[in-house]
A protein has these predicted regions:
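A domain-level signal for the structural core that forms small-molecule/cofactor-binding pockets
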Residues: 2-114
Length: 114
């Protein structure tokens, strides 16, 4: 925990090495001080086909899934930092966005908890 899942247009992977992109999001999330390094997970899904801005414009959207308990201010801070970093890396990409969702402690289970 947390999980950051990047959805992007396929062309993004030609603009920047995917591993570098994942590392930038990872490092930005870690820099907030909210998460332990070994708990952060970042994944990427690229889409060959999408309809954005009425056409095939490039985009990046990050789905941030974090354990409940963070303040709205903390969630806004991490959102702003990740979008700022992505905007620095991809200044010509017209759509860069993020949303943060809370996991509920009561319903989250992984195999180490069994």
């Amino acid at each position: 925990m947390p999980h950051f899942i990047l959805d992007c247009s396929e062309n993004i992977l030609e603009l920047k090495d995917p591993k570098e992109l994942l590392e930038e999001v990872f490092d930005t999330a870690f820099s907030t001080g909210l998460f332990k390094r070994d708990a952060i997970k970042v994944r990427l899904n690229s889409f060959k086909y999408s309809l954005v801005l009425g056409g095939d414009s490039d985009f990046i959207h990050v789905f941030g899934n974090i354990m409940e308990g963070r303040t709205e201010m903390q969630k806004e801070d991490i959102s702003r930092k990740i979008v700022t970093k992505l905007n620095q890396l991809f200044p010509d990409v017209p759509i860069i966005s993020i949303n943060i969702r809370d996991f509920e402690k009561s319903s989250y289970i992984n195999k180490t908890m069994l």
